[in-house]
């Protein structure tokens, strides 16, 4: 499989793209809420010499829009199952994408040879704060959810400076955003005791305290895990610290 792909199912299409070392170990990059596969490109390029890298737009985002849903983690695991087509893979999940990776590890078992999570939200817990970008997005109407999420994440000034085309694209993804985050707040999409895959639990020391707490919780409750901090990084470490992200949170999976 090479280049851009469109995987179709009864529920809708999923856009994906593969690059890197042909025949190398497969690494799948799973983006977070209101993001897209293009946001994982810098990290992907760090890995092209050592792995085959698959990036994809999760249902309802970017080139996988429009999509009728549902947008739960369980449905997204089925999208991932289709993209893997039986191949073994290492899964790298940024933010919400970490929940997809963990749920896939539980569902697909030995087919998943390693998992990395980075500042993955555990928003079904009572201790998870209700003032996060995700919480604000869920509390908004679908038409306004994406804008509210982005303003909370990057600030009003940066949002207003975005091109109108970009803002329009983000706003139309509000349905996917509300659908996936609402589902996540209702119940855990995986059980730590049922995940045996090695997991690297990442966070940045310039990120929010609750994201660090979430990474520590994962490390404490998964059976085979390590806690990894990227020095100087915030929530978007895959973009701002892509080399460190690859070295600390991806390459260890390829060395075993």
Where are these regions (language model features)?
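Conserved HGGG/HGGXW glycine-rich cap/lid loop of the alpha/beta-hydrolase fold
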Residues: 10-66
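Catalytic histidine-centered segment of alpha/beta-hydrolase-like enzymes
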Residues: 230-246
